[in-house]
């Protein structure tokens, strides 16, 4: 099964300890760890700063499973939870893949940190989970909430720590097995 992981900087593997936007090495990025744990090839389509696309995406031809985790940057850019959820609904409806082959993940909620100084941001990020769960149920798309995995975030309140990547990959692998 060819897995495509589509997301933001946490999917990309951004290392917040590097001022210039460095990346964790492959041994510490959840996408690469997942590939190793499942013994399945994965394609990392994570991108720093990515918000939910307003149109569909061109998936690699060999894509069999699509894992989506987005919404954090939309919240950080000032969108309220209802707007983000509506964007996700529109995006999901544009994807040309059987819905059962998609996994929608609500990202871990933001925490107070160098990039997050507002309770409103944190609350908006928390509200994504229930909205995404509803969208997934309406479309018969598998869903999980990464908040239940207690993924450690770095000092910025946004990005996974190295340990966070390991926990995320392990929990996701258990879900996919």
Where are these regions (language model features)?
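Residue-level detector of flexible, active-site-proximal loop/helix-junction positions
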Residues: 10, 49-51, 109, 150
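Alpha-helical cap/lid subdomain in secreted, periplasmic
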Residues: 37, 56-177
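Serine-esterase "nucleophile elbow" of acetyl-processing enzymes
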Residues: 1-46, 56-62, 166
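Short glycine-rich, polar/acidic loop-and-turn segments at beta strand-coil junctions
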Residues: 46-51, 72
């Amino acid at each position: 099964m060819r897995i495509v992981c589509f997301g933001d900087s946490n999917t990309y593997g951004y290392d917040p300890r590097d001022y210039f936007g460095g990346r964790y090495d492959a041994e510490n990025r959840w996408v690469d760890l997942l590939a190793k744990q499942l013994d399945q090839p994965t394609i990392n389509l994570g991108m720093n700063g990515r918000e939910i696309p307003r149109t569909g995406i061109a998936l690699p031809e060999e894509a069999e499973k699509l894992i989506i985790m987005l919404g954090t940057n939309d919240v950080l850019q000032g969108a309220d939870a209802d707007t983000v959820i509506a964007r996700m609904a529109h995006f999901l409806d544009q994807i040309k893949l059987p819905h059962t082959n998609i996994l929608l993940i609500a990202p871990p909620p933001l925490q107070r940190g160098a990039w997050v100084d507002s309770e409103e941001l944190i609350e908006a990020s928390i509200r994504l989970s229930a909205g995404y769960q509803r969208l997934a149920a309406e479309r018969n798309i598998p869903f999980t909430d990464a908040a239940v995995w207690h993924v450690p975030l770095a000092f910025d309140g946004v990005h996974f720590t190295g340990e966070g990547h390991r926990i995320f990959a392990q929990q996701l692998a258990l879900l996919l097995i």
